[in-house]
Design a protein with these regions (language model features):
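N-terminal accessory segment detector
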Residues: 1-89, 93-110, 124-141, 146-150
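A short, contiguous, amphipathic alpha-helix enriched in charged residues
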Residues: 110-120
């Protein structure tokens, strides 16, 4: 019995964030999305500043690849599709927030953190596109980070 209870519990801080956001979204609907996005964007700024302080100055490609790198070592491993000075594309086969099938809107709200982290590191604007997403029911996430021209 104990084993079944544990399997229903979040196993990481990211899973806890996902459960909290899904619950908040379920209760408050679309009104919750700007709040979720704002909180995750602000947290992304904090994390980006910490990474920049630790790692120093770097270009967009290096910052994006450095940020993505842990996902390349977790099972199932993410893949880099392309990495240039203005565009980094990846495929991920597992959602750290457990958003599978919960919709693109909540995914995009939570992923505001990721583009903010990279943007803060390089002091530039980043756009994240998600043409495929586990949250939308796709078999993988296809994330595209794009450095915007100023």
């Amino acid at each position: 019995m104990e084993k079944n209870i544990k399997s229903d519990l979040p196993q990481s801080h990211m899973e806890v964030q996902g459960v909290l956001c899904k619950t908040f979204y379920k209760k408050f609907g679309k009104e919750a999305l700007p709040i979720i996005e704002d909180v995750f964007r602000r947290w992304g700024k904090v994390l980006g500043e910490r990474m920049k302080q630790k790692l120093g100055d770097m270009d967009f490609k290096t910052a994006a690849l450095t940020y993505i790198e842990p996902a390349l070592h977790r099972e199932p491993k993410a893949e880099i599709i392309i990495a240039t000075g203005t565009r980094v594309e990846m495929k991920a086969y597992a959602c750290p927030y457990l958003l599978n099938g919960h919709g693109k809107e909540i995914c995009e709200a939570m992923m505001a953190m990721d583009s903010e982290i990279i943007g803060t590191i390089i002091k530039d604007k980043i756009k994240l596109e998600l043409p495929k997403s586990l949250a939308m029911g796709d078999e993988y996430c296809h994330g595209i980070f794009i450095k915007l021209e100023q």
